[in-house]
Each structure stands twice: as structure tokens, then as C-alpha cells.
Amino acid sequence: MRAACLFLLFMPGLLAQGQYDLDPLPPFPDHVQYNHYGDQIDNADYYDYQEVSPRTPEEQFQSQQQVQQEVIPAPTPEPAAAGDLETEPTEPGPLDCREEQYPCTRLYSIHKPCKQCLNEVCFYSLRRVYVVNKEICVRTVCAHEELLRADLCRDKFSKCGVMAVSGLCQSVAASCARSCGGC
């Protein structure tokens, strides 16, 4: 019984030793794995760093200091003749923006305390009160966004443009004003 217990105790160790058995040959020997690359490596390109005579760190530092840098100026465009200048049509970019002020009215709902008294007993209750606040608001308007909005409006509500050109704007003025800002 004692021998069986000792055998079972040492069994995992014996199994583990068998897994890590050292073979004299690696699983992928170099001579088998890389032999077809031998003809592709040119021996003239091979550089053995061990053949170089070792230099002291001071000599290496001095050789690094002797390296000169050559500064090459960047090419500058030659100025064109006055007749050759062509201006390209540019579309408004993201920098073509302006701040625009407009009157805006905001409606707020607040709870205002309201004092109510009955004979000599007073109590407070909250009453909902609507406050109209007239302000001057500021928005940033960019030209490229206005062009996109105008294109979308023209595509989506083409009848507004047709009616405006033909002079019949009043017949569709309400729908055009809601969608595109009027005729």
C-alpha cells in the first residue's frame, strides 16, 4: 500500500520528465529547413562585423564628429510672367464663416412660488409660469454650408425656384418659406 502511494506521488514527475526529453537534434534542423536559401544569399553582400578591428570609444566618437552634413536648399518656384497668371475659381472653404446675430425668443416654464392666505393662515404653492425671453442670439454661418443648404433646397423643393422665377411665388410662399426660407 505504501509503495503504491509513493508510486502515485512520483508518477506526475516521471511523466513530466518524459515530456521534456532533450533531443540531440532540434525539431527543425537548420540544414533541412534553410538549405534551399543557400543559393540566394550572395557571399559578396555578407558582412562580418567580427572582422573589423575594434576601435576605442574615443576613436568612434571622433569619427562621428567628423561627419559633415550637406544642406540642400528647397527649390523655390520661379515667379511667372504677368500674362501667365491664371486665377482658379475657388469655392468657399471652411474659413469663409461669419457670425450672424438674430432675434430669438425663448419660452421658459418655471415654477414660481405663490403665497395664498385664507383668514390668517397662509401657505405657499408652486404655480407654473411661462416666461417669454426675447434675446439676441448669435450663430456662425459658413458660406459652404449655405451653398449645400441651397443645393439641397433647390433639389428637394424645385417648385419654389420655378414659382419664384415665373412670378407665382405667392401661391407656394408658405411651403417655400418653411422649407427654404422664402422665395
Curated annotation (Swiss-Prot):
Disulphide-bonded residues: C153-C183, C160-C176, C169-C180
Swiss-Prot/TrEMBL keywords: Disulfide bond, Extracellular matrix, Glycoprotein, Pyrrolidone carboxylic acid, Secreted, Signal, Sulfation
Organism expressing this protein natively: Mus musculus (Mouse)
The protein's role, per its UniProt record: Component of the elastin-associated microfibrils.
Protein name per UniProt: Microfibrillar-associated protein 2
Pfam families hit by this protein: MAGP
Regions of compositional bias (Low complexity) in chain numbering: 59-70
GO molecular function list: fibrinogen binding; fibronectin binding
Main subcellular localisation: secreted
Region (Disordered): 52-92
Signal sequence interval, chain numbering: 1-16
Residues that bear Sulfotyrosine: Y46, Y47, Y49
Record's subcellular location: Secreted, Extracellular space, Extracellular matrix
Family annotation (InterPro entries): MAGP (IPR008673), ShKT_dom (IPR003582)
Domain ShKT: 153-183
Stated family: Belongs to the MFAP family.
Subunit structure: Forms a ternary complex with BGN and ELN. Interacts with FBN1 (via N-terminal domain) and FBN2.
Post-translational modification: Forms intermolecular disulfide bonds either with other MAGP-1 molecules or with other components of the microfibrils. May form transglutaminase cross-links.
Residues bearing the modification Pyrrolidone carboxylic acid: Q17
Gene label: Mfap2
GO cellular-component term (any): extracellular region
One example of a Gene Ontology biological process annotation: embryonic eye morphogenesis
